[in-house]
Amino acid sequence: MKAATFGQVTVAALTASLLAACGGSDNNDDSVSQTATFNLGISDAPIDAAEAVVVCFNAVELTGQGQPIQYEVGVDVEVPAENDLCRDSNGDVIANTIGIDLLQFTGSEQTQFLQDATIAAGNYGQLRLVMGEGSYASVDLDGDGTTTDVPVSVPSNELKLDGFTADAGGNLNYTAEFDLRQGMTNPVGQEGFILKPRGVRLVDNSSVGHLQGSVSEELLLNETSCEVAPADLTTPVAYIYLYEGIGYDLSALADIGGSEQQQPYASTAVYFDGAASYDFQI
């Protein structure tokens, strides 16, 4: 059987990488190991006004090569051990679940979620993150500095991401990238937040990078809505939006939830450093 090693999966968005451990060969020499390594990480783009966004994961599932392959928290060695961040309504720890605070892994930071998993070579139609119960966001609802834990739910308890191809002998590294400003909503009339798949994408680490820079104070001063020197340096002073393509007219560029033609690919906040610089990383 041709196989690939699914080496490492990380979340914070989520990154995964696939490495070729051995050269691929079409002969029947069983001494040639046709495997690939898959790594997955998780990472996030920050969300406004939240102190924590803890998402509870139960498993990673790969589909497209016969029966789905599932790696379950607390059962399989390729995924991290369960922790005590996910609790039910009685305060009891939910078994076989790991809670990850996405706000701890923003920008280029990530946490490992799947490591050294051996999978059959071939095309995989989807990577699914199977969610557990107990996800929540800690937010300041009244602006008084006190946070409240608000439930976060995921439709169908699964985040279905794009697929990938595992070549025999390959080593893949991917990230499941969460953009909570796009994917987490608080519908009117409903309790809690909803985390939608549109705010999560599977990214090949070998083909992406991160941008960082600063915004001029003059530009911010020209925008009357920007508070350029907040007392709390964790308060964003502005936001940066990244779009796919070039040459667009400014009037065609939408912000998060806007109706204009060109929707942002990603976004991030700009922060004042307390001295003279306004910095961002995306």
Predicted segment positions?
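C-terminal motif of bacterial Sec signal peptides marking the signal peptidase cleavage site
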Residues: L18-A21
